[in-house]
Amino acid sequence: MSHTMQRRHYVDIYGPTVGDRVRLGDTGLIAEVERDHTSYGDECKFGGGKVLRDRMGQMPGASNDEALDCVITNALIVDWTGVYKADIGIKRGRIAAIGKAGNPRVMAGVTPGMIVGVTTEVIAGEGHIVTAGGVDAHIHFICPQQGYEALASGVTTFVGGGTGPATGTNATTCTPGARHISLMLQATDVLPLNIGLTGKGNTSSPEGLLEQVRAGAVGLKLHEDWGTTPPAIDCCLSFAEHEDIQVTLHTDTLNESGYVDDSIAAFKGRTIHSYHSEGAGGGHAPDILRICGEPNVIPSSTNPTRPYTVNTLDEHLDMLMVCHHLDRNIPEDVAFAESRIRGETIAAEDILHDLGAISIISSDSQAMGRVGEVITRTWQTAHKMRDQRGRLPEEQGDNDNFRIRRYVAKYTINPAIAHGMSHEIGSVEPGKLADLVLWRPQMFGVRPELVIKGGLIAWAQMGDPNASIPTPQPYYMRPMFGSLGAAVGETSIAFVSSRAMDEGSIRRLDLKKRLSAVRRCRKIGKADMRLNNTLLPITVDPETYEVRAGGELLRCDPAKILPLAQRYSLF
């Protein structure tokens, strides 16, 4: 017998369904449910008197192999692939299927492989948003505490380099040399994150590069502080082509060894991930943004300039002096710093992100960027652009779904593709590692409710451990069992080069994390960036710093007020 429910009542019990709209935090961004894979009347719901009981939603007789390990019920999935509602099935640490879970003997439309049995755990996803774990592809490994800060924000993968608070690491994302790479892989083996380390690529002769890749480096970093000259760029890219690894780039701010055209010429059309394709982070001054118009360049920017606000310029000078070991008493150092901080190009960076011309947002952790704010700054940028530029022409219906999908891709699937990791992570799709983040809509982008790492809860909002229920104050993000002991190795990946895997030398490190080789890092480019593949000719006036893309002047005002800020946090 059918039963009709009021929409508000249905949403309260099972979460939003097709046509319902959800505001993301206190932003102006509205997500609308595009489709619903659950079956009306047969929804999964756990609790006293609810559906997931024996011989109802839970199928008796289902073996451990047949049943899911865990099911997230009635989740609103926000991913580059769409904005939709579904159950998410997890098996052996991976997303087994997305659709309708339950007992196929008594329920309609149960998706194959989504049986709920006596061996199945449940996470109530109704009323929550689920996104893929974030991928931060610009990490300075300055201190291990970054990992926990990032995980608490919803980031589950680090790509970058460093050896701790060494002067070189404070400025550059390089783990130089085979010994450092081995030691850092061992040191980060206890962090509940997927890890990929980049070696140092600044050399005009290839000796020394092979040893780093053999030790497990997933890429090589070219940084101006080590000398990013055209010969070094050419040498590093030539080596990377042979090894199928990514090259990350921070170009020459001072234009001592050449200008932006010289760096572009040194690329010779080869794939490169250009860090700081932005308004103030470094690289050829003042026109590094031109690099965003090259088809072989995967451009990214970092969160200190995300988005452009009335405080951005003042904050940057002090940060820059510290991060790059500069001296206020040396005029040339001050001139170097000031040349990198330009309001006009920072404003253009906002718009280039909104156009999909800059493909990735990352942190630049403790080296001008904040490791725990990648996700927050991304959504603040999206809100600012929605507020200043209005709806995107690609939008359909009374929602911001396309813009939402574009921005979530910047810190999930696109960095995963750029670094050859998208076969494992980066999206909410079957077969991927179950790195998933649950958010209450009102806290979206600021504070996750649960962070699931490889199918097990690693971090979560939790109340007083001595309380009689989980929710009494103080209620804040705390480490959970997925971040402890041997579970870390079972639920996380150490990404390494294919050479390290093939030669087998990496196994002598006895890492507890599963090893996975990066793949298809070469022969890709802007066109491979999901929803962020806009290619326009970009010019920067050397006198006024005005930026034009496709002939259009890119100009916007700095924000005075942002969402996801002091309404949620004391500091």
Curated annotation (Swiss-Prot):
<dbReference type="InterPro" id="IPR032466">
    <property type="entry name" value="Metal_Hydrolase"/>
</dbReference>
<feature type="binding site">
    <location>
        <position position="250"/>
    </location>
    <ligand>
        <name>Ni(2+) 2</name>
    </ligand>
</feature>
<dbReference type="InterPro" id="IPR029754">
    <property type="entry name" value="Urease_Ni-bd"/>
</dbReference>
<feature type="binding site" description="via carbamate group">
    <location>
        <position position="221"/>
    </location>
    <ligand>
        <name>Ni(2+) 2</name>
    </ligand>
</feature>
<comment type="pathway">
    <text>Nitrogen metabolism; urea degradation; CO(2) and NH(3) from urea (urease route): step 1/1.</text>
</comment>
<keyword id="KW-0533">Nickel</keyword>
<feature type="binding site">
    <location>
        <position position="138"/>
    </location>
    <ligand>
        <name>Ni(2+) 1</name>
    </ligand>
</feature>
<dbReference type="GO" id="GO:0009039">
    <property type="term" value="F:urease activity"/>
</dbReference>
<feature type="binding site">
    <location>
        <position position="223"/>
    </location>
    <ligand>
        <name>substrate</name>
    </ligand>
</feature>
<dbReference type="GO" id="GO:0043419">
    <property type="term" value="P:urea catabolic process"/>
</dbReference>
<dbReference type="InterPro" id="IPR011059">
    <property type="entry name" value="Metal-dep_hydrolase_composite"/>
</dbReference>
<dbReference type="InterPro" id="IPR006680">
    <property type="entry name" value="Amidohydro-rel"/>
</dbReference>
<feature type="active site" description="Proton donor">
    <location>
        <position position="324"/>
    </location>
</feature>
<dbReference type="InterPro" id="IPR011612">
    <property type="entry name" value="Urease_alpha_N_dom"/>
</dbReference>
<dbReference type="GO" id="GO:0005737">
    <property type="term" value="C:cytoplasm"/>
</dbReference>
<protein>
    <recommendedName>
        <fullName>Urease subunit alpha</fullName>
        <ecNumber>3.5.1.5</ecNumber>
    </recommendedName>
</protein>
<feature type="binding site" description="via carbamate group">
    <location>
        <position position="221"/>
    </location>
    <ligand>
        <name>Ni(2+) 1</name>
    </ligand>
</feature>
<feature type="binding site">
    <location>
        <position position="140"/>
    </location>
    <ligand>
        <name>Ni(2+) 1</name>
    </ligand>
</feature>
<comment type="similarity">
    <text>Belongs to the metallo-dependent hydrolases superfamily. Urease alpha subunit family.</text>
</comment>
<dbReference type="InterPro" id="IPR005848">
    <property type="entry name" value="Urease_asu"/>
</dbReference>
<feature type="binding site">
    <location>
        <position position="364"/>
    </location>
    <ligand>
        <name>Ni(2+) 1</name>
    </ligand>
</feature>
<comment type="subunit">
    <text>Heterotrimer of UreA (gamma), UreB (beta) and UreC (alpha) subunits. Three heterotrimers associate to form the active enzyme.</text>
</comment>
<dbReference type="InterPro" id="IPR017951">
    <property type="entry name" value="Urease_asu_c"/>
</dbReference>
<dbReference type="InterPro" id="IPR050112">
    <property type="entry name" value="Urease_alpha_subunit"/>
</dbReference>
<dbReference type="Pfam" id="PF01979">
    <property type="entry name" value="Amidohydro_1"/>
</dbReference>
<keyword id="KW-0963">Cytoplasm</keyword>
<keyword id="KW-0378">Hydrolase</keyword>
<feature type="modified residue" description="N6-carboxylysine">
    <location>
        <position position="221"/>
    </location>
</feature>
<keyword id="KW-0479">Metal-binding</keyword>
<dbReference type="GO" id="GO:0016151">
    <property type="term" value="F:nickel cation binding"/>
</dbReference>
<dbReference type="InterPro" id="IPR017950">
    <property type="entry name" value="Urease_AS"/>
</dbReference>
<dbReference type="Pfam" id="PF00449">
    <property type="entry name" value="Urease_alpha"/>
</dbReference>
<feature type="binding site">
    <location>
        <position position="276"/>
    </location>
    <ligand>
        <name>Ni(2+) 2</name>
    </ligand>
</feature>
